[in-house]
C-alpha cells in the first residue's frame, strides 16, 4: 500500500504494480526469514492504494507471486473493483466476488478472505473438482 489509510486512494501511482508489490514482498520475506520467521502468508492488498486497473493487473499476474514459495491470500470479496466495474453496490457484488475468487484460484491463490462463506466454499469445492 502506498500512502496511509487516510490518503491511499488519492491517485495511487505505480510504474508496474505487480513488479513493485513483488519487489516489496521479496524484501519483506527475506527480512522475515533472516529473523527466523518462516510462517508467512502473502496478501497483495487488493484495493489498498490501488486503482481498479491495478487490481485487475495484480489478479491477472497473481501467479508471479508463487516464486515467493508462500501461500497467497486474496481479499476481493465485495471490493470496489467489482461494484465500480459492474455499476452495482457492494451488497450486489456476490456474483462478481465469485468470479474473482475463481480467477484468483486459477492464478495461484491459496486462501480466500470472504464475507459470504457458503458461496466461497461452493466456489472452492467446484474449483477443487475441476482441478482433480
Where are these regions (language model features)?
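Active-site-adjacent loop and "lid" segments of alpha/beta metabolic enzymes
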Residues: 1-34, 49-132
Amino acid at each position: 500500500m502506498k500512502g496511509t489509510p487516510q490518503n491511499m486512494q488519492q491517485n495511487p501511482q505505480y510504474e508496474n504494480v505487480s513488479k513493485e508489490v513483488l519487489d516489496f514482498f521479496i524484501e519483506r520475506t527475506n527480512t522475515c526469514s533472516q529473523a527466523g520467521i518462516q510462517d508467512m502468508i502473502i496478501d497483495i492488498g487488493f484495493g489498498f492504494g490501488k486503482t481498479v486497473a491495478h487490481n485487475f493487473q495484480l489478479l491477472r499476474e497473481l501467479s508471479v507471486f508463487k516464486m515467493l514459495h508462500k501461500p497467497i491470500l486474496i481479499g476481493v470479496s465485495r471490493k470496489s473493483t467489482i461494484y465500480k466495474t459492474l455499476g452495482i453496490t457492494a451488497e450486489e457484488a456476490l456474483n462478481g466476488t465469485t468470479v474473482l475468487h475463481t480467477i484468483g484460484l486459477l492464478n495461484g491463490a491459496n486462501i480466500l478472505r470472504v464475507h459470504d462463506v457458503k458461496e466461497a466454499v461452493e466456489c472452492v469445492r467446484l474449483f477443487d473438482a475441476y482441478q482433480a
